[in-house]
Every structure is written in C-alpha cells, then in structure tokens.
Curated annotation (Swiss-Prot):
GO terms for biological process: tRNA methylation; tRNA wobble uridine modification. Residues 215-365 form the TrmE-type G domain. InterPro entries: G_TrmE, GTP-bd, GTP-bd_TrmE_N, GTPase_MnmE, MnmE_dom2, MnmE_helical, P-loop_NTPase, Small_GTP-bd. GO terms for cellular component: cytosol. Its cofactor is K(+). Keywords: Cytoplasm, GTP-binding, Hydrolase, Magnesium, Metal-binding, Nucleotide-binding, Potassium, tRNA processing. K(+) binds at residues 225, 244, 246, 249. Transmembrane segments: none annotated. GTP binds at residues 225-230, 244-250, 269-272. Mg(2+) binds at residues 229, 250. It is found in: Cytoplasm. This is tRNA modification GTPase MnmE.
C-alpha cells in the first residue's frame, strides 16, 4: 500500500496564471475533506470551493476528482487548480503535507502508474521525453509511443524468446518428453536468425532516426576570405561571426546551434586554412583540421577557379568517410554561362544558400517517423542493441558446434534485455534511477 504524495504538476513559475497541485494515495479524499470547503466530487468530476488552513482561506480553487484505479496513476488522485505563483502554491502544499501527505519525489506519480500496471516503461519514458522535446519532430516521434505499438513489438520479441527458452529447457531437463518440439540445430538456428533479422532492422531504423535527437556537427572549412563566417551567419539568419575583408579574421572556432527541417546541427566556423607564420593563426589552423576530424559533415567552401593546393588536398583526405560537400561561394559574381550543373553554388552574403541546405539534408530524408520499430530513448536503444549482440553470440555458438544448453545463456540474456525495455516491477534500482529524471509532479 502506497502513502499519500503531493507535488506541483504545472511547474512553479512566479507569474503563471494557474497552478496545478496533484495529490495521490489511499487517503487523499479524506485529506481534501479537511482542507476543502466544497463537495467531494464523483469520479472524473470538478467541484468549486476554497482551500483553507484551519479557518483561514488560502485560495479559491477548482478541484478535479479521479477515483482509482481508472485513472493515470491507478489510485485515488486529486488535482487542485489554484491561482498561479509560488506563494499560494507553497501554502497549499504545506497545508496538504500538514494533513497527512508528503512531497513527491521526481517522477513518483509516473512510477506509481507503472507499478499499478497503468503504463509500461516505454510509454513512461515517452511521456518524459515528450516533455523535454526540443523540436516539433521530437514531439511527434515521442507522442507516437503512446499508442503502445512499440511496446507490442518488443513484447512480441519477448514472447518468441520465451518460447525458445522454454522449449530449450524442456529439451535439456526432459529429453524423453515427446510432446514438445525437439530443438535441434536445424530448428533452433532459423528461429534465432529470424529474430536477429527483426531486431537488426529495428536497430537500423532507430539509429537513422537518432538524427532528430542528436546534434550533428558541421565544420565549415576553406581558405581565408572565402566567406565561411558569412555562411555561418546566413545559415543562422543572424550575425554570429565577425565578417571583414581582412584575411585571418577568424582565429578560433565559432560554434552555433541551428535546426533545419527538425534536425539539430552544430555549426563550426573555423579559421581560414593557409600557409602562415603567425603563431596564433597557426594554432587556429590546427584547430580547423581537428574540427574536420570531429565533424560528421564537412562544408568545403571555395571560390570559382580556385586552384587546389596541399591544404585543399589535406581537407579532402581528412574528410574521407564523412559527408563532404564542396561549395562554390559568391555565386552573384559568377556569370551564368560559367555555372556548372554538377556543382553547388551559393551567395552566403546575400543569403542564397538553398542548394546547400538541400545537400545537407539529402541523406537525412525519407525517414518514416511513424515506424513503430524505431527506438530513440538512449536506455531502450542500448538494451535492444545488447539483446541483438546476445542473439548473435548464440547464433555464433550454434554454428561453432555448441549445444542448446550452452547457448541458452546468451538467449536468456537477450530476453532479459528486452524485458527491461518495457519494464519489470521487481527491478527497484532501475526504476528509481529512471523515474528520478522525471519532472516533479509527473
């Protein structure tokens, strides 16, 4: 049996119009009778009244009543809609605590909902991820997890592994039992390979969709005065970098974040790369090379008819295995008959960069955000990758001649990882760690 908990669910901004205080537990209706002047409402009803401390009125409120177990938390819950601000909210909290509740830990309402069987960990984490979404695409991806299709997919994998494990154990412990399928190599290997294929596809889709949650680093490199800082400013639509006609103006890396089609990028405007005897400028050039190594996308900015030198070749060499985009700047100064169709031309100073933006996004298109097999949550993705590794180890073991009683260890590990994605109520340490990252009142 849980105790009674309370928290502000709407945050605690100083000047917000409304504050929502949530209570949950076995005695919350009785607590409300002590401090609320209105009627105790029926399930899913709203009543009007005042919150009082002894006979002193604290606030005029609307109270929403939710009888357990048919609500989010799965137990009696009350939500008080009070006037906003820290002072009034704090007074109401103190009054509730004085009458038999305690302050909730972060995520404790969601944790109770999980323990009461109202949601699994996939949906619980989707709620938290939705709250912390930074882009529209992130929010769309997270809300899709509410329909439980991802959970159903994981549970289907779990059930297939349960069948394999159960059959293996019967074959090991009761080899004389005739009513169960004999798991020979010819039977077990295809089943595991089918599972490997399913999980591999989920991991592949998940890795691709991570672009909407990770920051993709882009290094803008090239010679001095080719327009790198102007390009950074054009992409950001603001003046972040200093732009002059003096070569070597940028001597350190200037970083800025921007979102393009819902994808987060980290732009890095680097020092111009050339031969220099200036000690400070040489340090900046070395940093430019380092940024090429550390970035996923390299925008190599050049001018028309620019000859390739040793530094240009080094940029290309360091860009091997990365997305390399060669861009010709100052398009407005080039006659139309000299523009080639297979090249990307821009005018950074005039903000004419649409062709470059298309090139940046090219490899990140055609991702189906509705695919329920996609897993973006870091904890869940690590677990499904671990389960895939264990299944691959089991397959490898069988192909090397090991018997089912040996590889069942790897198969069981794969099952445990998948079970921990949707959640196990007996793993208290996991639950405490996960729900502690939630907001107060959630």
């Amino acid at each position: 049996m849980f105790d009674n908990i309370v928290a502000i669910s709407s945050g605690a901004k100083v000047n917000q119009a409304i504050s929502i205080i949530r209570l949950s537990g076995p005695d919350v209706f009785e607590i409300m009778k002590k401090i609320f002047t209105g009627k105790v409402g029926k399930d899913k009803s709203i009543t009007y009244g005042y919150i009082k401390n002894d006979q002193e009125i604290i606030d005029e409120v609307l109270v929403m009543w939710f009888k357990g177990p048919n609500n989010f938390v799965g137990e009696d819950t009350v939500e008080i809609n009070a006037h906003g601000g820290i002072v009034v909210s704090t007074l109401i909290l103190e009054t509730i605590v004085a009458n038999g509740a305690r302050l909730a830990e972060p995520g404790e309402f969601s944790k109770r909902a999980f323990l009461n069987g109202k949601l699994d960990l996939v949906k619980a984490e989707a709620i938290n991820d939705l709250i912390h979404s930074k882009t529209v695409q992130q929010a769309k991806i997270n809300i899709k997890k509410f329909d439980r299709k991802t959970s159903m997919f994981i549970n289907d994998l779990i059930n297939k592994l349960v069948f394999i494990i159960g059959t293996c154990e019967v074959n090991i412990d009761y080899p004389e039992y005739d009513d169960i399928e004999e798991l020979t190599l010819e039977v077990l290997l295809p089943k595991l390979k089918d599972l490997e294929k399913e999980i591999s596809k989920a991991v592949e889709l998940s890795e691709r969709s991570r672009i909407y949650f990770n920051e993709i680093p882009i290094a803008i490199v090239g010679r001095p005065n080719v327009g790198k800082s102007s390009l950074l400013n054009a992409l950001l639509e603001e003046d972040k970098s200093i732009v002059t006609n003096i070569e070597g103006t940028t001597r350190d890396v200037v970083e800025a974040r921007f979102v393009l089609n819902g994808i987060n990028f980290l732009l890095k405007d680097t020092a111009g790369i050339r031969h220099s005897e200036n000690v400070i400028e040489k340090i900046g050039i070395e940093k430019s090379f380092k940024q090429i190594q550390d970035s996923e996308i390299i925008i190599h900015l050049v001018l028309e008819n620019q000859d390739e030198d040793d530094f240009e070749r080094k940029i290309k060499e360091l860009s091997e295995g990365k997305k390399y985009i060669r861009v010709i700047n100052k398009k407005d100064l080039i006659s139309k008959d000299k523009i080639k169709k297979d090249q990307i031309y821009i005018s950074a100073l005039k903000g004419e960069i649409s062709e470059l933006e298309k090139a940046i996004l090219f490899e990140y298109q055609n991702i189906d955000l509705d695919d329920f097999r996609m897993i973006q949550n870091t904890r869940q993705l690590a677990l499904i990758k671990s389960s895939l590794f264990s299944i691959q180890e089991a397959i490898k073991g069988l192909e090397q001649g090991y018997t089912p009683d040996v590889v069942i260890v790897d198969i069981t590990k794969a099952w445990e990882d998948l079970v921990n994605i949707v959640g196990r109520a007996d793993n208290e340490k996991l639950l405490d760690s996960m729900f502690s990252n939630f907001c107060l009142g959630k």
